[in-house]
From Swiss-Prot:
<feature type="transmembrane region" description="Helical">
    <location>
        <begin position="11"/>
        <end position="31"/>
    </location>
</feature>
<comment type="function">
    <text>Golgi membrane protein involved in vesicular trafficking.</text>
</comment>
<feature type="transmembrane region" description="Helical">
    <location>
        <begin position="68"/>
        <end position="88"/>
    </location>
</feature>
<feature type="topological domain" description="Cytoplasmic">
    <location>
        <begin position="111"/>
        <end position="143"/>
    </location>
</feature>
<feature type="topological domain" description="Lumenal">
    <location>
        <position position="89"/>
    </location>
</feature>
<feature type="topological domain" description="Lumenal">
    <location>
        <begin position="32"/>
        <end position="35"/>
    </location>
</feature>
<keyword id="KW-0333">Golgi apparatus</keyword>
<dbReference type="GO" id="GO:0042802">
    <property type="term" value="F:identical protein binding"/>
</dbReference>
<dbReference type="GO" id="GO:0016192">
    <property type="term" value="P:vesicle-mediated transport"/>
</dbReference>
<feature type="transmembrane region" description="Helical">
    <location>
        <begin position="90"/>
        <end position="110"/>
    </location>
</feature>
<protein>
    <recommendedName>
        <fullName>Golgi apparatus membrane protein TVP15</fullName>
    </recommendedName>
</protein>
<keyword id="KW-1133">Transmembrane helix</keyword>
<keyword id="KW-0812">Transmembrane</keyword>
<dbReference type="GO" id="GO:0000139">
    <property type="term" value="C:Golgi membrane"/>
</dbReference>
<feature type="topological domain" description="Cytoplasmic">
    <location>
        <begin position="57"/>
        <end position="67"/>
    </location>
</feature>
<comment type="subunit">
    <text>Interacts with TVP18.</text>
</comment>
<keyword id="KW-0472">Membrane</keyword>
């Protein structure tokens, strides 16, 4: 069903997370000159650190509190928001923001595409169904 291998999503998420962490760290240097950019960098770090962390370990409570990280639409919208947050500063931040924006739009397109299956880390460990899963067990009769 999926033309895109699952390793692509892992590499894309790790690279976008690392690029955005570096961009947010470079914005932290604006603490004395521009407080608004500094605060945007703090929000940028808060959004980009979980992107990298979720590729290695998925905490069980995060499905309940930050479910937008576990769908293409939610992740795409968060990437677009993150691209707007980190795009202040030098040329590196602008390029990182553009790359993040393009990947966010691509993830939104993947959400509405029928041919891309969601990666394994998007599925909750205890749930039998997830978004786009058509394998429903209808053999159980409800009383």
């Amino acid at each position: 069903m999926s033309v895109i291998p699952p390793k692509f999503f892992k590499i894309a998420n790790i690279s976008i997370g690392c690029i955005d962490i570096i961009a947010a760290l470079s914005q932290l240097t604006y603490i004395f000159t521009n407080l608004n950019v500094f605060l945007l960098a703090v929000y940028g770090l808060a959004l980009s650190v979980p992107i990298v962390y979720l590729e290695f370990k998925v905490p069980s409570n995060l499905y309940r509190y930050a479910s937008f990280y576990f769908s293409f639409l939610g992740r795409g919208l968060s990437y677009i928001l993150l691209s707007l947050i980190i795009s202040f500063g030098g040329i590196y931040n602008i390029l990182a923001g553009m790359f993040t924006f393009i990947l966010g739009v691509a993830f939104i397109v993947f959400h509405f595409s029928q041919f891309v299956e969601e990666p394994a880390n998007f599925r909750a460990p205890g749930s039998s169904l997830s978004i786009g899963d058509d394998d429903i067990d209808d053999d159980d009769d409800m009383i």
